[in-house]
């Protein structure tokens, strides 16, 4: 079994295509469950952000697994497979590992070095785990990716500029409005991106903030945080969006909705009086109706505009050191995986040896029924010691050999030499399949 990645991002597809492909939180469980119906896929995780959609899966066969995943995504997006393949990319085995490590490190982001993707990877894992779609392989892969991402950010200067999609958008808004200090802002969506936007708007010096969200409670919590920072903040639901639009100079929106939440009529009504209004539309799909950009006095900063901004590539100078860390960590991960794959074979061999020892001791009992208990115990200990010593060197060596590229052949040779039952090896591998969730994945 190997890891297969099927995805599309800002590097391979235009925004209109990414909008079709976007998989919202509500749809992710459906996609996961549909893909897992195939016997060719044993684990699956969906990573969907404002500029990428990627499915990571553990598959029994490359071509079969690719067909299952591709068809599931195509059906979700309402696209034909021929159209989808124009924009999709595929990574397998080592290349899939390297890609996820690069993504978690911010190396593949629209804004190189941004850190929000770490939380997005963590959320993708949590969703997959909650739907029993994660086994040992994706657990270890996700844990390693998060650790690598943190290491890159702590050991390199890749995020020294503090850039993110939000900061790039707000810099553009600042330029359009001749400054954000003293302005009134609205944040539509109180999730992680909305929280980040709120924090950056506060640092930019806004005076007033409207927090708009479907859930009034989440909006109130975010507004309370802003008030603690000295900003006059109010929380409203989406039903009252018009109140915020009527007052705001800049609107930052990222709701995760499947269709626009800000319509042409909403904005047209809010613009009465001839004022200027800047929208930072960070949603994928878009939160702001595209026709809004044609209104006088309106500026829409969307993902396509952000992608063209030179600031989004400013951190690339530090990418070399980050890439070296990723390469080193990929090698480390693959070594660990190869050793993990041979471990069930070694364990099955030791179990087989223990069974042989016990069978021979039973034969001894039949031949020497009068053997004293203490003497029998000493014989048993001696036999077990001999077997352990005989097995120690070859099992240690096979783990070492298996850790090198192409080392799976040594485990196969061990199974053949000792006639180990494949079902026994598989049972050993399955037992304790998923370790306890780690702090990396849940903090």
Swiss-Prot record:
Gene3D superfamilies: Glutamyl-tRNA reductase, N-terminal domain, NAD(P)-binding Rossmann-like Domain. Its EC number is 1.2.1.70. InterPro entries: 4pyrrol_synth_GluRdtase, 4pyrrol_synth_GluRdtase_dimer, 4pyrrol_synth_GluRdtase_N, GluRdtase_CS, GluRdtase_dimer_dom_sf, GluRdtase_N_sf, NAD(P)-bd_dom_sf, Shikm_DH/Glu-tRNA_Rdtase. It is an enzyme of class 1 (oxidoreductase). One of its GO terms (biological process) is protoporphyrinogen IX biosynthetic process from glutamate. Substrate binds at residues 49-52, 109, 114-116, 120. Keywords: NADP, Oxidoreductase, Porphyrin biosynthesis. GO terms for molecular function: glutamyl-tRNA reductase activity; NADP binding. The keyword Oxidoreductase applies. It catalyses: (S)-4-amino-5-oxopentanoate + tRNA(Glu) + NADP(+) = L-glutamyl-tRNA(Glu) + NADPH + H(+). It comes from the Bacteria. The record marks 99 as: Important for activity. CDD domains: NAD_bind_Glutamyl_tRNA_reduct. SUPFAM superfamilies: Glutamyl tRNA-reductase catalytic, N-terminal domain (SSF69742), Glutamyl tRNA-reductase dimerization domain (SSF69075), NAD(P)-binding Rossmann-fold domains (SSF51735). Coiled coil: none annotated. The active site is at 50 (nucleophile). Homodimer. During catalysis, the active site Cys acts as a nucleophile attacking the alpha-carbonyl group of tRNA-bound glutamate with the formation of a thioester intermediate between enzyme and glutamate, and the concomitant release of tRNA(Glu). The thioester intermediate is finally reduced by direct hydride transfer from NADPH, to form the product GSA. Belongs to the glutamyl-tRNA reductase family. Possesses an unusual extended V-shaped dimeric structure with each monomer consisting of three distinct domains arranged along a curved 'spinal' alpha-helix. The N-terminal catalytic domain specifically recognizes the glutamate moiety of the substrate. The second domain is the NADPH-binding domain, and the third C-terminal domain is responsible for dimerization. This is Glutamyl-tRNA reductase. It comes from Mycobacteroides abscessus (strain ATCC 19977 / DSM 44196 / CCUG 20993 / CIP 104536 / JCM 13569 / NCTC 13031 / TMC 1543 / L948) (Mycobacterium abscessus). The gene is hemA.
